[in-house]
Amino acid sequence: MKFTGKVWKFGDNIDTDAIIPARYLNTFDPQALAAHCMEDADPDFPKKVSAGDIIVAGENFGCGSSREHAPIAIKAAGVSCVIAKSFARIFYRNAFNMGLPIFESAELFDRVDEGQTITVDGDSGVILLEGAQTPLSIQPIPPFMQELIADGGLMKHLARKNRG
């Protein structure tokens, strides 16, 4: 599982209301959610994000209320993965359940600039920064979690397993 994309940086304590404002929770349509993804944190994000881009954030990303809408919005916006110093535990679980790859890195936020291109190798646990000589390490995603992501989330994974 390898991703290359442009970095969008967000600070600490980005809550689920900043990821997808509550006023848009009347739909589960991924494209409708994508149109408003991160707009309270950066009003230009939904218009400027491109497929494959990567969100890099500070501590406690995804805190606040539990809602599956948040990882759905991020994924539907075209973001390939999210890397943060830390995640709220409920967001961490929801992200994998919805098939959104996420990684924790204590170092990346302070070493990368918004707009910089990075490559994330989730299998080997390496992040390469454009123009940097030294790679950063991350914890690789365990094989079972990689299966969830490859299948598009927990429900699709269970449906595939039940079909046998």
From Swiss-Prot:
Q: What is its EC number?
A: 4.2.1.33
Q: Name one GO molecular function term.
A: 3-isopropylmalate dehydratase activity
* Record keywords, A-Z: Amino-acid biosynthesis, Branched-chain amino acid biosynthesis, Leucine biosynthesis, Lyase
Which GO biological-process labels does this protein carry? Answer: L-leucine biosynthetic process
Q: Which reaction does it catalyse?
A: (2R,3S)-3-isopropylmalate = (2S)-2-isopropylmalate
Specify the pathway: Amino-acid biosynthesis; L-leucine biosynthesis; L-leucine from 3-methyl-2-oxobutanoate: step 2/4
- Tell me the InterPro entries matching this sequence: Aconitase/3IPM_dehydase_swvl (IPR015928), AconitaseA/IPMdHydase_ssu_swvl (IPR000573), IPMI_Swivel (IPR033940), LeuD (IPR050075), LeuD_type2/HacB/DmdB (IPR011827)
HAMAP family per the UniProt record, alphabetical: LeuD_type2 (MF_01032)
- Family of the protein in this entry: Belongs to the LeuD family. LeuD type 2 subfamily.
- Relate the assembly described in the record: Heterodimer of LeuC and LeuD.
User: Any idea what job this protein has?
Assistant: Catalyzes the isomerization between 2-isopropylmalate and 3-isopropylmalate, via the formation of 2-isopropylmaleate.
Protein name, as recorded:
3-isopropylmalate dehydratase small subunit
What is the species listed in this Swiss-Prot or TrEMBL entry?
Syntrophus aciditrophicus (strain SB)
